[in-house]
Each structure stands twice: as structure tokens, then as C-alpha cells.
């Protein structure tokens, strides 16, 4: 699933680069427009990398800790009910 998302992002980036190159060849973009589009593309890439890092943090750190906490709490509750019932 992540591979298809990465592939689509790469293809979108290639399409953007191709469209910018086509405009440069036609003389529609100046150097300022090109540098601005490059800066925007870099900012977009950094934003996507940040989102991926946050996603990994959530999936690999926070969710397991939350599951561990909830699991221990549930086990304590069930064990106390079990003991009360049989003791």
C-alpha cells in the first residue's frame, strides 16, 4: 500500500517537472518563476516527508504504547472480576 502511494507521489512529481520544463522551452517561465516553482516543490517534498515521519511515529511508537496500556488495564479489570467471582 505504501509502495503505491510512493509511486503516485513520484509520478506526480515527474509530471510537474515535465510541465515546468515544457513551459520553460516555450519561453513562458522566467528564472524567478522557475526558482519559485522549485522552492514550492521542495517545500511540498519536505511536507510529505514530515507527514510520513509523523505517520511512522504514530504507528510504531504511540499506538503500541496505547495498546499496551489498554491491554494491561483490561487484564487487571478482568482478573479482579475473575477473582471476585471464584473467591
UniProtKB/Swiss-Prot annotation:
The keyword S-adenosyl-L-methionine does not apply. GO terms for cellular component: MIM complex; mitochondrial outer membrane. The chain crosses the membrane at residues 54-71. It holds the Pfam family Mim2. It comes from the Eukaryota. Residues 1-53 are cytoplasmic. Its main location: mitochondrion. Keywords: Membrane, Mitochondrion, Mitochondrion outer membrane, Protein transport, Transmembrane, Transmembrane helix, Transport. GO terms for biological process: mitochondrial outer membrane translocase complex assembly; protein insertion into mitochondrial outer membrane. InterPro entries: Mim2. Disruption phenotype: Causes severe growth phenotype and leads to reduced biogenesis of mitochondrial proteins and abnormal mitochondrial morphology. Compromises import of multispan mitochondrial outer membrane (MOM) proteins. It is a single-pass membrane protein. It is found in: Mitochondrion outer membrane. Residues 72-87 are mitochondrial intermembrane. Component of the MIM complex required for outer membrane protein import. Involved in import of the subset of proteins with multiple alpha-helical transmembrane segments, including UGO1, TOM20 and FZO1. Component of the MIM complex containing at least MIM1 and MIM2. Interacts with MIM1; interaction is direct. Belongs to the MIM2 family. This is Mitochondrial import protein 2. The gene is MIM2.
Amino acid at each position: 500500500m505504501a509502495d503505491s502511494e510512493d509511486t503516485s507521489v513520484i509520478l506526480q512529481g515527474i509530471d510537474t517537472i515535465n510541465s515546468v520544463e515544457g513551459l520553460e522551452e516555450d519561453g513562458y517561465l522566467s528564472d524567478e518563476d522557475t526558482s519559485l516553482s522549485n522552492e514550492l516543490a521542495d517545500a511540498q517534498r519536505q511536507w510529505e516527508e514530515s507527514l510520513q515521519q509523523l505517520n511512522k511515529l504514530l504507528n510504531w511508537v504511540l499506538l503500541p504504547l496505547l495498546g499496551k496500556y489498554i491491554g494491561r488495564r483490561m487484564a487487571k479489570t478482568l482478573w479482579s472480576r475473575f477473582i471476585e467471582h471464584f473467591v
